[in-house]
Each structure stands twice: as structure tokens, then as C-alpha cells.
């Protein structure tokens, strides 16, 4: 067995890094990442955007949903290198710091669409994507069907469905339609 000196291992790691350039929440980001780094890890650990949660690491719960080029994706099964050259929006990017909440965020607040809040960022990102894809007049059935990949262990979903329906209508009245 050959043992490599420590500096050789460090050099190999540098060589194996991938350079990525992307837009995150409207800001250009350039970074070197291990090609195996998940997008959720990159967002949370490298960029300190901790609103995107890791609930299952298996694409089952939806707590990690972000928008990649305007479409909802699960960041726990998306490699950071797959976002190279693309635009990512996280829950932090929906509303400006210190500014008003996004209409969907406001609807979740008004209609008590959360309890512990762990699933909420993923639910909201999924809901915004749903409105962009299906329009503002959503039936309860459509909302529930579209939420199949998002799990909540607290609320029983009724208030989440009400929140999404209200948020969809509010988005129709805003510039964020």
C-alpha cells in the first residue's frame, strides 16, 4: 500500500474541485466546490443561506425545495455543479431583507399555514412554483396533489392548503404573478 504525504492529498483535493458560477437570489456567486457537494449543502454551508432545510436527504420531504431557473427542485438531490450557469432562488430570495413578505409568505402567516416551521420554506417554494405553472385559481384537490412531495408532521395540511389558495390569489393582485 502506498501512503501519500499530506500535501499530496491536499493537492489532489484542489485538482478535483469544480468551479461554478451561478446567480443566487439575484447575486452572482463564483465558487470552487467538490463535485459531490449537494446544492443544499452549498447553499447552507458555503453561502450561509439556512432557510433551505435538510429533512430526509432522500428527496421525500420537500424541506429543501428551491427554484432553479424558476422551477422547483429538491436541493438535497441536486448537485451544486448542476446549478453552474443557472439561477437559484431560495426562501431568503422571495422577499427583500427588511421589505414586505412575498404574498405567499404573508398568506402562510395570515392563515396559520405553519406550526414548527421546518417544512415551511419548502412548502412556500413549492407553492410559488405551483402558481407559476398552474395559475391563480387553484382547487384544493390540485393543491393537495401538487404537495405530494412535501411533508409536514405538524399541521394536517388543511391550513397549508388554505394558505396556498390565499397566496395564489394574492399573487394575482401583485407584481409577482
Which sequence ranges carry the predicted segments?
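Signature of N-terminal electron-transfer/Fe-S-associated modules in redox systems
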Residues: 3-177
Amino acid at each position: 500500500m502506498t501512503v501519500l504525504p499530506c500535501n499530496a492529498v491536499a493537492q489532489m483535493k484542489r485538482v478535483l474541485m469544480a468551479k461554478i458560477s451561478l446567480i443566487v437570489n439575484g447575486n452572482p456567486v463564483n465558487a470552487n466546490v467538490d463535485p459531490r457537494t449537494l446544492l443544499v449543502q452549498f447553499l447552507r454551508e458555503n453561502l450561509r443561506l439556512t432557510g433551505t432545510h435538510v429533512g430526509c436527504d432522500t428527496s421525500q420531504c420537500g424541506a429543501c425545495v428551491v427554484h432553479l431557473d424558476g422551477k422547483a427542485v429538491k436541493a438535497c438531490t441536486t448537485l451544486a455543479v448542476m446549478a453552474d450557469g443557472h439561477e437559484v432562488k431560495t426562501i431568503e430570495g422571495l422577499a427583500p431583507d427588511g421589505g414586505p413578505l412575498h404574498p405567499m409568505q404573508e398568506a402562510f402567516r395570515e392563515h396559520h399555514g405553519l406550526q414548527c416551521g421546518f417544512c415551511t420554506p419548502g412548502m412556500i417554494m413549492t407553492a410559488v412554483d405551483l402558481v407559476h405553472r398552474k395559475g391563480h385559481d387553484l382547487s384544493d384537490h390540485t393543491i393537495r396533489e401538487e404537495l405530494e412531495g412535501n411533508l409536514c408532521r405538524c399541521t394536517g395540511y388543511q391550513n397549508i392548503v388554505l394558505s396556498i389558495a390565499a397566496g395564489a390569489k394574492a399573487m394575482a393582485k401583485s407584481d409577482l404573478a
